[in-house]
């Protein structure tokens, strides 16, 4: 299960590296440090994000599960990062002028959280479907909290630029529901 968790973290880091690129958020910092494209160049950031995705699946290949369990785990994790349900879909929604906020949150963040809960269950030999809703709900809650932080925090408080959602016209809970919800 540690290998599955590490693979999901590699995918999460890849999504952050890609999200910070100039074609998306053009973030100067991440976690209080220069973003990868600012520190090393845009081409190297793109390749680094891609390499993290490959590394995640190479890491999963090290698991010594039975083939059925491995197949289910690969499907769950690849779905969380792909389209039409995963991180790729969530990133694509940011390019659209009108977006259903719940669908966007489920794709952008809920899919990865769901993969974490489901993959943990599958790796332990349990039924992953029983854990899907928990992951989706945690992901949506996290994304709403992140939307609030983007609107109400300072860069020093959260270690990354703020106000990006509003400046870029991105879907977010504040824009749709207001600060008081």
Where are these regions (language model features)?
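All-alpha prenyltransferase/terpene-synthase fold signal
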Residues: 1-181
């Amino acid at each position: 299960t540690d290998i599955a968790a590490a693979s999901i973290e590699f995918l999460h880091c890849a999504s952050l590296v890609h999200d910070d690129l100039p074609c998306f958020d053009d973030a100067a910092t991440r976690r209080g440090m220069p973003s990868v494209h600012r520190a090393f160049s845009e081409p190297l950031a793109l390749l680094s994000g891609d390499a993290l995705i490959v590394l995640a699946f190479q890491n999963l290949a090290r698991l010594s599960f039975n083939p059925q369990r491995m197949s289910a785990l690969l499907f769950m994790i690849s779905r969380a990062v792909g389209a039409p349900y995963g991180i790729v879909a969530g990133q694509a929604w940011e390019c659209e002028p009108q977006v259903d906020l719940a669908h966007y949150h489920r794709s952008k963040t809920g899919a990865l959280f769901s993969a974490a809960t489901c993959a943990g269950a599958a790796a332990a030999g349990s039924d992953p479907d029983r854990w899907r809703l928990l992951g989706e709900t945690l992901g949506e809650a996290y994304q709403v909290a992140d939307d609030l932080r983007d609107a109400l925090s300072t860069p020093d408080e959260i270690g990354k630029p703020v106000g990006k959602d509003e400046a870029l016209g991105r879907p977010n809970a504040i824009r749709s529901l207001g600060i008081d919800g």
